[in-house]
UniProtKB/Swiss-Prot annotation:
One of its GO terms (cellular component) is cytoplasm. It is an enzyme of class 2 (transferase). CDD domains: DEDDh. Its main location: cytoplasm. Its EC number is 2.7.7.7. It holds the Pfam family DNA_pol3_alpha. It comes from Ureaplasma parvum serovar 3 (strain ATCC 700970). This is DNA polymerase III PolC-type.
Length: 1442
């Protein structure tokens, strides 16, 4: 019998020498072509490595080999060698090479097949925990199929002698430099580091080792020396404090990722890497390892051993500047790779003194271009490339009064040698003559002999060869014959207007013959106007009209003419039946349909702003093109354009241009007519026409002839002509990035305009020298100089030098008497609360705020916000404030916010005695007490928030009043604003949706997948290079969730911005600003009317309980306890997934992240909750900052939590208020404290740790916002404790459609099992265990349900008799809540309402009755059956007799 070893040799090309080193116990193969090789004895890592290499030479196709070591009788310390090997080939597991018998004890549990690791090194322990599953999976690949790891952190030092302890300490101090291979190397390199100077250049004299091109770096190499430019630098701070540096570098062949890890603290290489800039040229010696995070696992990356800087800047090729008027930026939707900042930098660096921008259809780059060019010696010419549509799109030429029924038609087609009659010829004519829907005579067909030879492309398309036309008549004779056939009849052709009729006319003129004057019907245009088809090719129309069409016979003139005759019969009938068209003269007027305009191709033009006054005209034009004249894309009519003739400069575009197309297809007189339309002529680069050349539609020589004609005709007409390459990217090499756009479908699945071209035109910036070289075909240096240099200078003088696209200063709307109304209302409310004699603190604060508000014209914002809140409250919906508005006491007294920013205080509601407690953290933490004067229980309030955080230190910052309305009420609030200011003065704040990092990565990866086969390995560094070019490219427009922009009545929106529909959806009721609101923030006021679930839930709670949220007590020890202790709910952690807090489902505190913060901080007061809210919403405020400080012993009240804390704390430290404010502003914006301010702080003994903490912060939350959030959270917690059923019913009612009754109906144990399964799979990297987005969304719902059940309540099943459409029903009798119908997945609100309406009329008697009287679907019915909801109903009313 054949041995297993011998059998294995038949499968793999293995040498006898290697085969003798292994003993195979078993070979098994599964259905998925996996071969499992089981060894008798333990096989070490070097042999496994050799076997892995041999596995690639398997003799069996697609066989995957898995080696399985014998784990039973082996010293498991041997796996250390496997750890070393894994660390060499997996960069993010490099810490494994630090594991040794000094820091790790290894044991094996054979019963569980589990490896037990006892680690005394915290960093290794942390890394192992974080990467446990990945290591387990990789070990299986390396023949070690452990089922699990048990990992323990233990102090092993007592087991070691002094020498070993010293070795351990040395490893601990160095192991996070994970790129070192041996302990000796670590020691040597550490000594080397210490000897370097502060301006460390990792090795000053690069070694003589040969430079390896990046494309040649491969996994089989151990190390290499590279020279490359840095194009991406990423720095990550690990939990351990170590720093991971990743550099993506590029040379002229490829890209590569190189990386290193450094310990926290000072390190010579750290300074070098921190200061390393993008575009610097570096040399590095690297060890080459595999990037195990890559998809293939075969991508090499480099571990930096040595590195130095060779050049400070990436020196790109020098260019000679040329004025270019048609730069395109990333605001041309998915169509350019030039960012606005890059454009300005490019212009400045290359000494372009003037640049023009003409993004396609939009002017959204204007604000950034103006911003970035402001301090540069650079003139901007603001332009636009857009599409012009004729006011009446012709479907019939040479219209006459002719009844369609009694007319005679010649239905014809021609075949030609190409598309362009100026360079191509007719080679076949076919026709049929039709009258009264019947063919007259025989079909007509004849060939025409061209002067030029018929090439292979033409033969392939038309099935006409040169041999077939050799004996045919010449073209002039043929044209005379065609005219005779046409007589005075009506002509019918498919695409006749743009091709057949024009082609014949141009060839007639070529031969000195009169052009056609016959009425001509274009069936392609009619189909576009009347047929809702996607394709209007003749074959596609035949299929829809049920006309026979043979693709093999198509594209021959006679066949196409016969088929078209049948199509025209159907079409003519439809014109009468659907449009009442009986006369030829009616077609053009009655068929100007939206479908026609959606499908017609217009003329692309470039428009430019001459002076400041014309900015408004451009904005009007852009607005109209995006709204009134939007036909699947922005367009503008010829007549509208004519009205702007004296206000905007107009030139032709280089693509899809009537003028450029006319050079190929029209006669000189027509070309002259078109030239006269333009203020100047744009001569395209030859490269811009290469798509036509490569498709063999025209030769480059003929393009040159056409361009010469354009130049000489323009000169003849005294029109200035200038050269343009219309750049979409800077350099020729950048075209590969542009190719991503060309091969990526845009929004709504629309293909890029060049997607079907065999060659994408060249659209880089062509500098002066190369432009001159290109125009050498003119053979006239003076003329070339005129076009390249002199004319652009002349045109430049037409434009003002200082056009500003944005207005400066605030333009607030005016309302008569609004200042006095505000003053009166504020004092009325203040005195109502605090008494006629206002406390000094209150009086001073009101005066201070009102002075600023009225002085800067902000009263109207406050007053309208007050009216909005008042209306919402009257309609039964509370409003929550966001942002810093709670910093304003005036806002409090106008009822805009519930937050009181005063110093914490007691207030007697009876006698108005007010007592301010200056040393208290928060008014809601003041212990209850009675008034000393009248014994009435005193109220408490005041959160100690400075006004400066809202309107700035001088009170002149434009106010952002953000209000949270109920989601169901938001639209009402929006329309309330519109009713006050009017539709033409109220706009939604616009947003611009750009390609984000993840989207760009997916797009680029898909591009590579489509371009290359799956065996082609694309490095992640290459993907990142492409991503960098694509990221931030505009995809679409949108609208701020609630921002409403107000334009003063004395102005037009066009004084500030164009407008459009969000995402160009013409069905939207609101228009948005074309510019993103961030650029209008300082000139126009915005009301943030946001939709939120919280006000909706609180409204439901009021309906359920009868208790208004305003009556919820804000001091309650049990509520306070619930934030950190689940026992406040009378349950234990073990009852709810080991949760220790009672904060599940509490807004802003219910997420797993914030619940973890609650555990860490153990809040004891309302002030603590505000701090936690601030910490959780900031960036780099908690993690790696406050969290560490608290763990080191600092109290929660000591750390920086909210931005206001900085100002108030520093003022207490005797910092001058303005300086404290400025420091706060720097810190909250992510800027470090200025050196001069740090000196002041240190002089005033502000702790160093405080300064360091502030300097880590990237963004800070305002205290007023945090306070508003906490107030809502507190109310939720109160209802949750005292009205639990009502609370859960309200909470789930707002989220009723995000529910899985199939899981929930099976009880607590099953829900917990489902939750844990999602949890485990979410941590797995196995694609088979991928968690769906719905499962992730349901996980927090399961938490809440488990808590509800643990508290002794129930969720009943859906009830046909009791369930409501969208809200939960409270069943007190059964201590339960009953879900609504929309809790069933897929059952929408419309269906749910139909069930309620039918039930209100009559109870459902049977399932059939339910089905007949509601809109319920088959799937809904099935789900109801599975849930057992219909068990008590019979199927039908029929009786069973037996």
């Amino acid at each position: 019998m054949e041995t297993k070893n011998a059998l294995f040799k038949k499968i793999v090309k293995i040498s006898d020498q290697l085969l003798n080193k292994i003993s195979i116990k078993k070979l098994t193969k599964d259905k998925k072509n996996n071969l499992f090789v089981y060894f008798d004895e333990f096989v070490d890592v070097t042999i496994i490595d050799e076997l892995h290499q041999l596995s690639k030479t398997t003799l069996m196709h697609d066989l995957q080999i898995w080696y399985i070591n014998n784990l039973k009788e082996v010293d498991h310390k041997k796996i250390l060698t496997f750890f070393k090997k894994i660390s060499e080939q997996n960069a993010n597991l490099i810490f494994l090479e630090q594991i040794n018998d000094l820091n790790t004890k290894i044991e094996y549990n054979s019963n569980l097949n589990s490896l037990i690791l006892k680690i005394n090194d915290k960093l290794i322990y942390d890394h192992f925990i974080a990467n446990k599953l990945e290591i387990l999976n990789i070990l299986k690949v390396w023949s070690l199929p452990y089922s699990n790891f048990e990992i323990h952190f233990e102090n092993l030092s007592s087991l070691l002698n002094e020498k070993h302890e010293q070795a351990v300490n040395e490893i601990i101090s160095h192991h996070i430099q994970q790129q070192k291979h041996l302990e000796q190397q670590i020691s040597q390199q550490q000594n080397f580091y210490n000897n370097q100077k502060a301006n460390f250049n990792y090795y000053k004299n690069p070694s003589n080792k040969t430079i390896t091109k990046l494309i040649d770096i491969n996994p089989l190499m151990n190390n290499a020396k590279i020279r490359a430019y840095v194009f991406l630098k990423k720095i990550d701070i690990l939990k351990s404090g170590a720093i991971a540096y990743k550099l993506n570098v590029i040379d002229d062949s490829e890209t590569l990722t190189i990386m290193t890890y450094l310990p926290s603290g000072e390190h010579p290489l750290k300074k070098f890497l921190d200061e390393l800039k993008i575009d610097q040229l570096i040399e590095a010696e690297i060890d080459i390892v595999l990037d195990n995070m890559s998809k293939s696992g075969q991508v090499p990356i480099g571990k930096i051993k040595k590195i130095c800087c060779v050049e400070d800047k990436h020196v790109k090729k020098q260019i000679t500047p040329r004025l270019e008027l048609n730069f395109h930026t990333k605001m041309s939707s998915l169509d350019a790779i030039i960012s606005t900042q890059e454009l300005i930098d490019f212009a400045v660096k290359n000494q372009l003194k003037t640049i023009g921008i003409t993004d396609r259809n939009v002017v959204q780059a204007y604000p950034e271009i103006a911003k970035f060019s402001k301090k540069q010696d650079l003139k901007i010419i603001y332009g636009l490339e857009t599409e012009e549509l004729e006011d009446q799109i012709p479907l019939v030429l040479n219209v006459r009064d002719q009844n369609l029924d009694n007319a005679t038609y010649v239905i014809f087609d021609i075949e030609t040698t190409g598309l362009f009659p100026n360079f191509d010829e007719i080679i076949e004519f076919g026709a049929v003559i039709m009258q009264n829907n019947k063919q007259i005579g025989e079909k007509i067909q004849f060939f025409i002999k061209p002067i030029q030879q018929i090439n292979e492309n033409v033969t392939n398309l038309t099935n006409i060869s040169q041999e077939m036309v050799n004996n045919a008549i010449d073209e002039k004779t043929a044209l005379l014959k065609i005219k005779e056939i046409f007589d005075d009849h009506i002509l019918v052709a498919h695409n006749g207007i743009n091709f057949d009729i024009n082609f014949i006319n141009q060839r007639l003129l070529k031969w000195g013959l009169e052009p056609l004057k016959n009425p001509s019907i274009d069936t392609l245009m009619i189909s576009r106007a009347i047929n809702p088809f996607k394709s209007h090719r003749l074959g596609a129309i035949c299929k829809k009209y049920e006309v026979d069409y043979n693709d093999e016979s198509a594209h021959r003139a006679d066949y196409d003419a016969i088929v078209l005759a049948d199509v025209f019969k159907v079409m003519k009938n439809n014109l009468f039946n659907d449009f009442g068209i009986t006369n030829l003269s009616e077609i053009n007027t009655k068929l100007q349909t939206t479908m026609l305009k959606n499908r017609s191709f217009g003329n692309w033009i470039n428009l430019y702003i001459k002076n400041q006054a014309n900015v408004k005209d451009m904005y009007e034009l852009v607005s109209i093109s995006h709204t009134d004249m939007y036909y699947t894309r922005p367009t503008i009519t010829t007549s509208f354009l004519a009205n702007k003739k004296d206000k905007l400069i107009i030139s032709n575009s280089i693509h899809e241009s009537d003028l450029i197309n006319a050079l190929y297809s029209k006669n000189d007189e027509e070309i002259k007519r078109l030239i006269q339309r333009y203020d100047f002529i744009t001569l395209p680069s030859l490269g811009s026409q290469k798509h036509l050349v490569y498709a063999k539609k025209i030769t480059i020589e003929n393009v040159q002839k056409a361009f010469k004609k354009l130049i000489y005709l323009a000169l003849e007409l005294n029109k200035i002509i200038i050269y343009s390459s219309s750049p979409y990217y800077f350099f020729k090499d950048d075209k590969k990035f542009y190719d991503v756009y060309v091969n990526t479908k845009g929004l709504e699945g629309k293909a890029h305009r060049f997607a079907n071209e065999v060659y994408v035109p060249d659209l880089e910036y062509i500098d002066q020298k190369n432009a001159i070289d290109e125009l050498a075909y003119l053979e006239d240096e003076k003329l070339i100089n005129l076009i390249i240099n002199e004319n652009p200078v002349h045109i430049n003088s037409w434009f003002d030098d200082s056009i500003q696209p944005l207005k400066e200063g605030l333009y607030a709307p005016k309302m008569e008497g609004v200042d006095q109304k505000t003053i009166d209302y504020v004092y009325h409310t203040a005195k109502k609360i605090y008494g006629e004699n206002l406390p000094t603190i209150v009086e001073q604060r009101i005066k201070k705020e009102l002075n600023s508000i009225i002085k800067h014209g902000f009263s109207v914002v406050y007053w309208i916000s007050h009216l909005l809140v008042e209306k919402s409250m009257q309609d039964g919906y509370g409003v929550g404030s966001r942002g810093s508005v709670g910093s304003s006491l005036v806002a409090t007294f106008l009822n805009i916010t519930d937050v009181n920013p005063l110093t914490p205080h007691y207030l007697c509601p009876n006698c108005k005695k007010c007592e301010f407690i200056t040393n208290a953290d928060d008014g809601f933490d003041l212990a209850p007490k009675s008034c000393e004067q009248c014994q009435t229980p005193m109220l408490t309030d005041g959160h100690n928030i400075p006004f400066e955080t809202f309107l700035g230190f001088d009170g002149d910052k434009v106010p952002d009043i953000d209000l949270n309305f109920s989601g169901v009420y938001q639209a009402v609030a929006h329309n309330f604003i519109k009713s006050i200011f009017g539709e033409t003065h109220s706009y939604r704040a616009g947003t611009i949706g750009t390609m984000a990092q993840t989207s760009a990565e997916n797009t680029v990866k898909k591009y590579f997948e489509n371009r290359f086969n799956e065996n082609k390995i694309i490095r992640d560094s290459t993907v990142s290079l492409y991503v960098q070019k694509c990221i931030d490219s505009k995809r679409t427009t949108g609208q701020h969730p609630g921002g409403i922009i107000i334009v003063p009545k004395e102005y037009s929106i066009w004084d500030f911005s164009p407008y459009n529909f969000p995402a160009n959806d013409i069905n939207e009721t609101w228009k948005t600003t074309h510019f993103a609101f961030e650029y209008l923030h300082d000139s126009l006021l915005k009301f943030d009317i946001l939709g939120h679930d919280n006000p909706t839930i609180l409204k439901l709670l009021k309906d359920y309980t009868g208790i208004d949220e305003r009556d919820v007590p804000m001091y309650d020890p049990l509520v306070m306890k619930s934030f950190s202790d689940i026992s406040a709910l009378n349950i234990k952690p073990s009852d709810v997934l080991n949760e220790t807090t009672g904060a599940i489902s509490i807004p802003e505190f219910g997420t797993r992240f914030v619940r973890g913060m609650l555990v860490d901080t153990k809040p004891k007061s309302f002030a603590d909750l505000i701090r936690i809210s601030g910490l959780s919403h900031g960036e780099s405020v908690w993690l790696g900052n406050a969290q560490s400080l608290i763990k080191s012993g600092k109290l929660l009240k000591d750390v920086i939590a909210c931005r206001d804390d900085i100002m108030t704390y520093l003022i207490r430290q005797n910092v001058e208020p303005k300086t404290a404010f400025l420091i706060m502003e720097d810190v909250r914006k992510g800027k470090k404290i200025k050196p001069e301010h740090q000196i002041i702080l240190k002089e005033l003994k502000v702790p160093e740790w405080y300064i360091e903490s502030a300097n880590k912060i990237k963004y800070m939350f305002p205290k007023a916002h945090a306070t508003a959030y906490v107030m809502h959270a507190w109310k939720f917690a109160w209802y949750k404790i005292y009205y639990p059923l009502e609370y859960y019913a309200a909470f789930f009612s707002v989220r009723a459609d995000n529910f899985d009754l199939f899981v929930i109906n099976q009880g607590k144990e099953f829900i917990e099992k489902t939750y844990n399964d999602i949890e485990q799979r979410s941590k797995s990297r196995d694609p088979q265990k991928k968690v769906s987005s719905r499962e992730l969304a349901l996980q927090p719902i399961y938490e809440i349900v488990i808590e509800l059940l643990a508290r002794g309540f129930k969720i009943s099943n859906i009830s046909i008799e009791q369930s409501q459409a969208t809200s939960y029903v409270i069943d007190k009798e059964n201590n339960a809540i009953i879900p609504p119908f929309i809790a069933i997945q897929g059952l929408g609100e419309t269906v749910a309402n139909s069930i309620i309406e039918a039930r209100n009329q009559k109870v459902f008697s049977t399932i059939e009755d339910l089905k007949n009287r509601t809109k319920i679907s088959r799937t809904d019915l099935k789900n109801l059956r599975v849930l057992g909801v219909l068990d008590h109903l019979s199927e039908t009313e029929q009786l069973t007799l037996f």
